[in-house]
Swiss-Prot record:
It comes from African swine fever virus (isolate Pig/Kenya/KEN-50/1950). This is Polyprotein pp62. The record marks 158-159, 463-464 as: Cleavage. Induction: Expressed in the late phase of the viral replicative cycle. Keywords: Disulfide bond, Host cytoplasm, Ubl conjugation, Virion. It comes from the Viruses. One of its GO terms (cellular component) is host cell perinuclear region of cytoplasm. The record marks 10, 39 as: DNA-binding.
Amino acid sequence: MPSNMKQFCKISVWLQQHDPDLLEIINNLCMLGNLSAAKYKHGVTFIYPKQAKIRDEIKKHAYSNDPSQAIKTLESLILPFYIPTPMEFTGEIGSYTGVKLEVEKKEANKVILKNGEAVLIPAADFKPFPDRRLAVWIMESGSMPLEGPPYKRKKEGGGNDPPVSKHISPYTPRTRIAIEVEKAFDECMRQNWCSVNNPYLAKSVSLLSFLSLNHPTEFIKVLPLIDFDPLVTFYLLLEPYKTHGDDFLIPETILFGPTGWNGTDLYQSAMLEFKKFFTQITRQTFMDIADTATKEVDVPICYSDPETVHSYANHVRTEILHHNMVNKVTTPNLVVQAYNELEQTNTIRHYGPIFPESTINALRFWKKLWQDEQRFVIHGLHRTLMDQPTYETSEFAEIVRNLRFSRPGNNYINELNITSPAMYGDKHTTGDIAPNDRFAMLVAFINSTDFLYTAIPEEKVGGNDTQTGSQTSSLTDLVPTRLHSFLNHNLSKLKILNRAQQTVKNILSNDCLNQLKHYVKHTGKNEILKLLQE
């Protein structure tokens, strides 16, 4: 069996084969994420310095008291663009430093830069996966410029993008809400296992109520993604620990500000209202997509017929696990292919449109696969926590640490821990989970209702799902006793949800009370009096 990869899902895998020392330096400088195409809208290109002198200088500065020079040199070798051939070396192109690259000469297989006089040729042995916008070039001589005029690249919708992704403070309004909820959850778990008041349920319902009342188009976008586990829904909608990029599912301007949600509690009977949102899934008949070819209007199938979506997902599941090569190479690649089809065409087995256009646009660049793996992992950890005979704060803290530092949503591809084909490569990419256990978790994920997830009404949770085997979903039970041991996570999540009985009795309607609460929070009693007089 060959020991070297011939096709690459990551630039880091190629570096591991060619220069593990340089890869280690990049990793030690916390720059590994900069080599991922998921961080940039237009892919990424890495310039590998063939000259030992440059690599030695990087190493010397990296392990000095001030590694800033090494970081700057490495940034000059990273281009936030997909440039596979000399033909693409055109227009406004620059490095991660923000310095513009000026081309002096282009040949069939070579590019010579003016500033720095770098001579670049495409790496002959770097072939990325078809769905990865990655490229590697070899710098034969010269150097990449560290100083010079800046470059500006156009956004697709006009204006200019900054040369690097935005960096957001770790203590954002989203983070503060999450910390508040986590503290409340820990307290109520120690008191009564949150059987009376579940903070995750309260905030999830409140956010969805706010969107439904004030931003119906955003509500339409996120509704197919909600999860029966309020903890899962909370983290997927709020994305509180994301610190890079601006591709939030729900924009900042909607959540915060004078007319924003701002974490306001908006519910009367949290559990009943939460379940009602799932009932609405089959009633959203006004979310239409115009087919670009026929100009006909299509209702997204996640709304018109969610059961059929699950049926098609089950076909994909069966095809993957009945494949004659169920193994650590073929199986994860088939999973990636299924999600790639969904992201690129909004279809499952050519059946679609599955989601509203706004939803699928928000899930591109591997966010959908990241989300579904996140569902699987968060709920598994949550269920394990709830199944313990006694509650330990340290175990819940471990879940939060996992979300905050391993799965914040900064780099979707790099944060895939179960479904990424790269996780089944050599020993350097498998992390701290044994390969066999990881593969068992992958099979369990495929066999779960989290695979190609779309939300369904409560009454549809049982059905045929319950006839295929095990209903367990604790992380300790993830190794199936047989290949098709089915994990009905939706049913498992409902069981946890039904423990919460948050109810506030009042004669006013829910919508009226929610509007009043929001006015109280943001405009004061004078506005409430006006509202009541109307």
